[in-house]
A protein has these predicted regions:
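Hydrophobic alpha-helical elements and their junctions with loops/disorder across both membrane
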Residues: 11-13, 53, 141
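Conserved catalytic network of the ASCE P-loop NTPase/AAA+ motor domain
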Residues: 49-52, 69, 99-104, 132-137
């Protein structure tokens, strides 16, 4: 409970500083078709967050393409190296990351669909689990999805910023 309380307090303070904290304080989704600038936007958000917070910032991607576009204060993780085969393995990976480092403030996940390897319509449990992890550990999740926002299931669409 104290971490969740601190999380809400931190979010209120950071909301004024961070224009990307509009939609939801726990999970945010950047959705758009391929080539619409999602990765550039999520990288900018991660770099801004690294400057504006004392918490650790983690950026998870499926390969090393954008590693050098990130500030050195951002911890880059190439999840492709961990052979995640499905959404359950992905959630185990996320749970492990948040449980081993209590100083993580935000986790940015690029190429979410490639990492979960599941049809988005079957991932409602993933988003519910991310909410629980966020509430318990005080970590915000920012995801990018290569999908037209109009085609997203309602349980994801509510997080789109």
């Amino acid at each position: 409970e104290p971490r969740a309380k601190a999380h809400r307090k931190r979010n209120a303070a950071n909301k004024a500083k961070n224009p990307y904290k509009e939609a939801c304080p726990l999970i945010q989704v950047i959705a758009g078709k391929k080539g619409s600038g999602k990765t550039k936007r999520i990288i900018e958000m991660a770099n801004t967050a690294a400057k504006d917070t004392k918490h650790d910032i983690v950026f998870i991607d499926d390969d090393n393409r954008y590693m050098f576009d990130l500030s050195r204060e951002v911890r880059f993780v190439n999840a492709g190296e961990y052979e995640l085969e499905n959404d359950q393995m992905f959630m185990g990976f996320i749970s492990g990351a948040t449980s081993q480092n209590f100083d993580i403030g935000q986790i940015f996940i690029d190429a979410f669909k490639k990492l979960v390897k599941a049809d988005l319509s079957t991932t409602e449990w993933v988003f519910k689990r991310l909410e629980k992890i966020s509430e318990k550990s005080g970590v915000d999740f920012i995801l990018s999805l290569s999908e037209d926002p109009a085609d997203l299931p309602e349980f994801i669409a509510k997080y789109v910023i």
